[in-house]
Amino acid sequence: MTEAQTRTEPSESSESSEAVAPAITSAADSAPEAPPATTAPAIENPLPEDRYLNRELSWLDFNARVLALAADPSLPLLERAKFLAIFASNLDEFYMVRVAGLKRRDEMGLSVRSADGLSPREQLRRISERTQQIASRHAHVFLDSVRPALADEGIVIVTWAQLDDAERAKLSTYFHEQVFPVLTPLAVDPAHPFPFVSGLSLNLAITVKHPDDGGQHFARIKVPDNVDRFVELPARGDSPGVVRFLPMEELIAAFLTVLFPGLEIVEHHAFRITRNADFEVEEDRDEDLLQALERELARRRFGSPVRLEVSDDMTESMLELLLRELDVAPGDVVEVPGLLDLSSLWQIYSVDRPGLKDPPFVPATPSAFGERETPKSIFSALRDGDVLVHHPYDSFSTTVQRFIEQAAADPNVLAIKQTLYRTSGDSPIVNALIDAAEAGKQVVALVEIKARFDEQANIKWARALEQAGVHVVYGLIGLKTHCKTCLVVRREGSTIRRYCHIGTGNYNPKTARLYEDIGLLTAAPDIGADLTDLFNSLTGYSRKESYRNLLVAPYGVRRGIIERIDREIAATRDGAEGRIRLKANALVDEQVIDALYRASQAGVQVEVVVRGICALRPGEPGFSDNITVRSILGRFLEHSRIIHFRAIDEYWIGSADMMHRNLDRRVEVMAQVKDPRLTTQLNDIFDSAADPRTRCWELGSDGHWTALPQEGHSVRDHQISLMERRRHP
C-alpha cells in the first residue's frame, strides 16, 4: 500500500490567498436554474459570535478518532497497526502544511484571526498542547498495546539487546554488506558545518569523544530511506511461524564504532524534523506553469523546520544543540517514547497474516453492466438509463475504468475529455487515454500538476500523455482543477451521443479500493452538453452563461447550495417537512454553516456526516438545536460528497467539500441526480449513516466528540452493512 492510499487530505495551505479566476460560471449564475422560492424571512434570533469551532483543533480531533481505531481491541491487530501508521502520516502532513502556514503568518505579523477568534500565535499554542497529548497517546498505544499484541501473535519487533550472538553475527554481515556502504557519518566542527537535515528523514544524533584530548564532537547519521525501516531476522528453529524485526536505527547504533573508528561513542539518540511544505506556485500568465512548479518543488526541500521529534531519552545538552543548529523553538519539540516515525508500520502491516487483517472483500459489478465474466457494453447500458456506482462496494475496474477503456478501443468514439487530479503509479486510465490518442481519437486531458504531494507524478503523466499526442492542459492559473469528470463523444449512426462520468473521487484504481466514493455514469443529453461547455471553459477562453444540471466552483457551488438551503427554509415555513442531509469530508465554510444555522432556526432538520474537520457547532439552543453532526471512520476512507434537500426534492453529488479552498480556489463540479432508482441508493447511504446503532462519533456543542453507540447498546458497522448488501442484494 502506498502513501497516497493512506492520505486523508487534512489540509491545504493558507485559506486567505486570492485566486485569479478564469471564465467559468455555473448553474447558480444563470437563468435556467430551478425556480427560486420566496425569500425566507429574516431570523429574529441573531447568530452568536462564538458559533464556529476552530478548524485546526477540529482536524486534530479527527486524527484522534483515527488513533481511537488503533486503540480499539475489537479490530484486527494488523489493521490497528495500519491506523497507527495513518495517524503518523496525517500528522506529518498537518505540520508540513497547516502549522507551516500559521507559522508564516505569525512571523509576518499578520493578525488575521480565525473564524473562532484566535490569532495565529494562539492557534499554534493550542495546537502544540493538543499535539503533545495525542502524540504521547499514539506512542503508548503502540508501546503498551499494539506492539505486545503483535509479539503474542508471532510478529515481534526486537531490540539489539534481545539478540543472541549468532543473530548478531549474521546482522554484522548484513550491515557491512548492505547498510554500511550507503551511510555517511557527518561530523560537526569548524571545518564541517552542521549538515542539512532533510524533512521527515530519520536520523541519529551522536556525541563522539576523541581519546587523545577528550574533546567531544557532534555527528549525525541519516537512516537511509531507500532500505526497509525494519530488518527481518532469519527464522529461529525453535520458533516456527514467528517473524522478528529489528529497527534499522538500532542496527546502525550497534555499529557506530565501525562508522567512527578510534572514537568513543558517548551518546546517541534518534531525531526527526518536519519542514515547511506550504509553498504556492507563483503563477505568471507569461511563464510556463510547468517550469514554475518544478522550480517550487526544488524549493520545498529547503523549507524551514516546523517540528522536531526526539526520543524521550535525549539529553538536555543534545536537545539544546539541535534546537540551536536547526533553529527550532522549544514549543515545536515533541518528545516520543519508543520508536519515532510510526508511519513505517506499513511494512509490518504487509506481513502475510490474513487472519490479523480485515477479511477480503470483492467489489460487485452493477447488474446494468453484466457479470464480471460476461460484461455488457457500457454504452448500451447507459442508453437504457443512468447508473450510480458506489466505490469500493461497486468495482472501479468493471465500471469507470471499463468505461474509459471501452471508449479508447471503440472505433465509433471520436473524442475523450477527462480531468486527472491524482492517479496511480501504473495507471490503466492514463494508458487508455494514450491508446485512444494513438488510435487517432481526439483526446484532451486536464492534468492538475499542482495537486499537493503528487506534483512529480502528475508531471510525469502529463509528459507521457503529450508524447502520445494527447492535448494536455496543465490546470488553470490561480485555480486547482479538482473536479472528477470524463466526457466521451461517440458517433451512433447519423447522430452524435455524449456519455459522461461525474464523480466524487479520483481516477485511481488503487485508492478506489480503499476510498468510499460516488460516481454518476449517464448519457443524459443535458449533462453531456454541460460537460462539453465545461471542458471548453477549461481548455479555451469561452465563457459559459448557464449550466443545466451542474454547479461549478469557484463561482457557483457555494451560491447554489445556499440558494437551495434558503428554498428548503421557505418550503418548511410553507408546511413542508424540511430536512437537509449533507455528507462531506469537511465543513468549514462560514457562509454555508450560517445558512445551515438559519435552516435550523426555521425548523429544518439538518443531518451532517463529516469525516474530518467540522467548524459547525451543533445542538446549541436557539440556532443549531436542529443540527446533528456524525463522523464515521473505518476500513474505507469516507470520501463522497452528497447533499439531499428533502422539501425541494433535490440530490447532488460532486467533488466539492464545504471549504474555502474548494469553493473559492478550485474548479469543482456538483451534479444533480434525478433518477428515483439512483436517489434511493443515496437515501440508503444516509439512512445507514444515521441509524442509531451505527458505530460513529457525534459532535457536541462544546466541540467534544463522543463515541456511539454507548456501551451496552446494539452496534452495527456502516461499511460492513454496505458490503453485506453487495454480497446479498
UniProtKB/Swiss-Prot annotation:
Keywords: ATP-binding, Kinase, Magnesium, Metal-binding, Nucleotide-binding, Phosphoprotein, Transferase
One GO biological process term: polyphosphate biosynthetic process
Composition skew (Low complexity), residue ranges: 25-42
Post-translational modifications reported in the UniProt record: An intermediate of this reaction is the autophosphorylated ppk in which a phosphate is covalently linked to a histidine residue through a N-P bond.
Enzyme class: transferase
A GO molecular-function descriptor: polyphosphate kinase activity
Domain of life: Bacteria
Active-site residue numbers: H482
Names of required cofactors: Mg(2+)
Catalytic activity, as annotated: [phosphate](n) + ATP = [phosphate](n+1) + ADP
Gene3D superfamilies to which the protein is assigned, alphabetical: Endonuclease Chain A, Polyphosphate kinase middle domain, Polyphosphate kinase N-terminal domain
Family listed: Belongs to the polyphosphate kinase 1 (PPK1) family.
HAMAP family referenced in this protein's UniProt entry, alphabetically: Polyphosphate_kinase (MF_00347)
Its job: Catalyzes the reversible transfer of the terminal phosphate of ATP to form a long-chain polyphosphate (polyP).
Full protein name: Polyphosphate kinase
Species, as recorded: Mycolicibacterium gilvum (strain PYR-GCK) (Mycobacterium gilvum (strain PYR-GCK))
